[in-house]
Amino acid sequence: MVFNSLILRARGLKKSYGSESVLANFNIDIWKGSIFGILGTSGSGKTTVLRMLAGFETPDSGSIEMYDKVIYNQEINIPPENRNIGMVFQDYALFPHLNVEKNIAFGLSKEEQNSGRLQEVIGMCNLTQYKNKFPQKLSGGQQQRVALARALAPKPEMILLDEPFTSLDAQMARVLRDEVVSLLRETKTTAIIVTHDQEEALSVCDIVSVLENGNVIQSATPQEIYLNPISQSVANSVGDPNILKGFSVDGRVETSLGSFNSAYEGALDVSIRPECIEINLDSMGPYTVKECIFYGHDQVISFQNNKGEIFRARSLPSVIYETGDKICIEVSEVTTFPSNY
């Protein structure tokens, strides 16, 4: 998907609480109509980013622009209500004393409510039958829809979603995630989603920034992040790869699983995704199956070499492997990066 218009740019954002640095020189470009993901573990600074973009938190330094208009720097700080940015909080932040309709109407003027926009958003978010109910009578998924509808109702330039599906069970999270993405695409709404869920980030977002200790480690398409991580840290953030140590000479790196091409020289980390290892039963094979975990759609095979090192491969569920089986392997793809990156 190609995006041509830059809607938001943040440069050099920093934030500390006392001696604890939460964000260090954070930069971001958001394109109109895109869904941008910020992926990071708890405490990485991702929620702080959203709060600064929305205007609820003041950066220590840096600048934020929307359509080339400054909304924050050391001289200017546009208040949240004038930034035209909607926010969906992790806990939804619905008003318990207001029904669904009044919760959604909260950010609309009387004129906007009477224009039909309120009922349009209620219908768009499949909430018509619930509009007279109060939040405490709704399921988690329904409350999430109300929070999203309230954020979308004023037609903001973008919406920010803070861990939007964390509190839902896995099945409901998948269903609602698909609904939300479909709605964002349909309305051409620009969105930033922060999440710790790698599957969510990869499947939903057009661009993903991996955040670690307040720093963006890599920002790229989901495919680029997954297939070409620039460090072991990024590789681990979007999967569970086998990380091997090796030393490259003349473009070849030797590892415990074989010799591979490398664009780098010297000490390297070699990342091999489990799905990039094909295994076959072989009574004379150099590897031994240690464990098999069956997931239905596939299975993860843990195997060991004669040095006692353990590796993982993903395999189709049709072949049954037993502990102690001898196997041989074939590696289809690897990613290498300098060990000291």
Which residue ranges define each predicted feature?
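Conserved structural motif at the start of ABC-family nucleotide-binding domains
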Residues: 8, 23-25
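The feature captures the beta-strand-to-loop junction immediately N-terminal to the Walker
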Residues: 39-41
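Helix-to-loop junction immediately C-terminal to a conserved catalytic motif
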Residues: 54
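ABC ATPase nucleotide-binding domains
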Residues: 84-86, 90, 94, 99-233
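ABC ATPase nucleotide-binding domain helices that frame the ATP-binding cleft
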Residues: 47-50, 146
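Conserved ABC transporter NBD signature motif
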Residues: 62-73
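Non-catalytic connector elements of ABC transporters
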Residues: 252-341
